[in-house]
Amino acid sequence: MAVFTAVSDADLALWMRHYDLGDVVAFRGIPSGIENSNFFLTTTRGEYVLTIFENLTAGQLPFYVHLMSHLAKHGVPVPAPVARDDGTLFGELHGKPAAIVTKLEGAAQLAPGVEHCVEVGQMLARMHLAGRDYPRHQPNLRSLPWWRDTVPAIAPFVTGEQRALLEGELAHQAAFFASDDYAALPEGPCHCDLFRDNALFAHAEPDTGHSVRLGGFFDFYFAGCDKWLFDVAVTVNDWCVDLPTGALDAARADALLRAYQTVRPFTAGERRHWGDMLRAGAYRFWVSRLYDFHLPRAAQMLKPHDPGHFERILRERIAHAGAPPETHACN
């Protein structure tokens, strides 16, 4: 999240006329993230998040807002879009599509333990299954076609060694994506960006036997229809990684994957290509972070991420790609 488009008090007052949310009590920008303009909004009716979409068009946005509404109705804890006075789930602010969603309970856990990974794994699988009957389709817009378009744009900014890695991994992933095995992998709506700062945890209720409770997943604006295994790989590459080295933390990875499979067991094809998908997940974010770092957009409060983090993760995944997935984690 970030602030690319400023919203004045007068802008907000006009915008809020289309909502039955009471009076505005507080309004402030959210500095984290890199894609949209986001604001915490407190009214006399509750707490919300206002998002102005900087890249998604009004034609693309229905997939995202209706997906969140669909998941919320199926018991998945996600922000629910708030309907406007005309019944629609988004409108236009400063010439850009914008929406208000409910604010989830809890706080991000930026140093997750095994117990957090268990909660995330189970809910991610529930989310995948809940999305099976979602009728709208939107591809993951940061997948192979985008990588092919973006790598030439960032190539002038990287070293020769990095360029060789970018182009070599792109060729590897293109071959994987073209394979029959890839085509057979289960798919459906995916979050595609489920990092530890896109989930919230609340205090567990007494006598539940749980030390933590997942408040929910949010920031679905990179979501798309993709292979479920890609969504799992993206999640594991963030929640279950040793930050200094990029290596997987075996205990957290085992916990997340076991928990996921209590809800949806992996297929044989998913187990076979776990290494390839871990590489795909790392590559996607290395490419996007290089792009955002070297070709940034003007923004208030923008905090770009370090591209080197996912370069390290990708190199780690390639170094261990020859090994089969650990049987204790993926059976």
From Swiss-Prot:
The UniProt record lists the keyword Metal-binding: no
Catalytic activity: L-homoserine + ATP = O-phospho-L-homoserine + ADP + H(+)
GO MF entry, a single one: ATP binding
Positions of disulphide bridges: none
UniProt record, GO biological process: threonine biosynthetic process
Signal peptide: none
Listed SUPFAM superfamilies: Protein kinase-like (PK-like)
Keywords from the named record: Amino-acid biosynthesis, ATP-binding, Kinase, Nucleotide-binding, Threonine biosynthesis, Transferase
Phylogenetic placement of the source organism: Bacteria, Pseudomonadati, Pseudomonadota, Betaproteobacteria, Burkholderiales
Annotated TM spans: none
Family as reported in the entry's similarity comment: Belongs to the pseudomonas-type ThrB family.
Pathway given in the UniProt record: Amino-acid biosynthesis; L-threonine biosynthesis; L-threonine from L-aspartate: step 4/5
EC number of this enzyme: 2.7.1.39
InterPro entries associated with the record: Aminoglycoside_PTrfase (IPR002575), Homoserine_kinase_II (IPR005280), Kinase-like_dom_sf (IPR011009), Pseudomonas-type_ThrB (IPR050249)
Enzyme class: transferase
Name of the protein this chain belongs to: Homoserine kinase
